[in-house]
Swiss-Prot record:
A GO molecular function held by the record: ATP-dependent protein folding chaperone
Gene name per UniProt: CCT8L1P
Species whose genome carries this gene: Homo sapiens
Superkingdom in the source lineage: Eukaryota
Listed GO biological process terms: protein folding
The protein, known as: Putative T-complex protein 1 subunit theta-like 1
Amino acid sequence: MDSTVPSALELPQRLALNPRESPRSPEEEEPHLLSSLAAVQTLANVIRPCYGPHGRQKFLVTMKGETVCTGCATAILRALELEHPAAWLLREAAQTQAENSGDGTAFVVLLTEALLEQAEQLLKFGLPRPQLREAYATATAEVLATLPSLAIQSLGPLEDPSWALHSVMNTHTLPPMNHLTKLVAHACWAIKELDGSFKPERVGVCTLHGGTLEDSCLLQGLAISGKLCGQMAAVLSGARVALFACPFGPAHPNAPATACLSSPADLAQFSKGSDQLLEKQVGQLAAAGINVAVVLGEVDEETLTLADKYGIVVIQARSRMEIIYLSEVLDTPLLPRLLPPQRPGKCQRVYRQELGDGLAVVFEWECTGTPALTVVLRGATTQGLRSAEQAVYHSIDAYFQPCQDPRLIPGAGATEMALAKMLSDKGSRLEGPNGPAFLAFARALKYLPKTLAENAGLAVSDVVAEMSGVHQGGNLLMGVGAEGIINVAQEGVWDTLIVKAQGFRAVAEVVLQLVTVDEIVVAKKSPTHQQIWNPDSKKTKKRPPPVEKKKILGMNN
């Protein structure tokens, strides 16, 4: 991202260079004026190849030793071990963006890097840090004020949201992208309330091995890939559900305590007391009307026999996320012990559903406006299912944003190029520090379409030049596609206004903080005195202090 056009502040600095100073050779690289720039560049270099619909994937080896093939910036950032505080700060901002909106993680990282690189150039040309910070804040405010004027499309309350989710799903580079997008869009649209509100937790995701992603489907109700235990396999009417985050059996089956038993009678009494306690707990569940128990821990065989006796279906959940979804949809608490809940979950039926080679447990409601739908994902490999699951969750979170603000802006880098044109026009007319800062901000924004073109394998300079010419002519709908520039309105590539605005705010917060940091001070514990072991003595002796004293500023210390 080298700057080719000197700004208003660059010319006096270049003319005032000392002729005795020769330029440095490439081997003698100048130190960064921004101490955080190198760390941010390193982090951005990891994320850059994954940006956009044509981004590449990476083999990610987690701390547990698992190898994951993913192009999701959020997953990559989460797995990285970072030490630099600037990298920590940037990752936190990017992850917050992903958690709040489901999109824009790579956008935050790459734009932060571009703005910091431009900021260092301005610092080299003599712009003071306080003025740089103030000018960047002014440019950010100008961007946020201009952004709503680019919203030329809106998602209607009865409109199919598939095209609005296309941009989010496209970043995961899944082969049956259109099929999954339509499934998620239909599920979100069906769950949406009449008043326009949308609860993401009412759309479940269930992964089953076998088949292909094209075999994925929607199921009425909430489906989990849990395991049915015992002889009771279904409740066909009036299911009352209890959820337990504990083993279905003794509270501590492997307790380290040792029972003091002095006779066979004591042993019989001890076993009888344990059995009576378990039967009492299961009997209390049955007395409260509980006929379905979902547990997160292990299932004890003796307790399972008691559950069959009382007609209770026992389901062993495979993940914490599944049981949390059940808790939110059924509106019943997740209990730490085998006690009847004060408010059991209610649904019409609980049964096992066979889908190809996989089995799912379905919680179904009889009413037409079912409170939950499940996207059932099929696949041959764990990695493929995991990538598809991430894409679906991100799309569900992304759909939540248009429900708050339905305005959409052009995607595929068109918005960034339009904002760069606006800042360039204003920056060329402004005097003082705002002019060069606006121009620097514009150059940083153009870096995002450049990255899209680079990841698509296009001639970057030609594509950016063509885009700039079209935008200068007033056509703000031209973005980067697979074979060149495209009309985003015709291709249906849109970004959500609220998500893009949140991304700009996150970037501004990080950049405005890092441009004022000049060095990193690490607090460490004072070193302990080393000890010398004397083999001739049984005692250890401390190393004697040095005899000579240093002088600092001409004074003995």
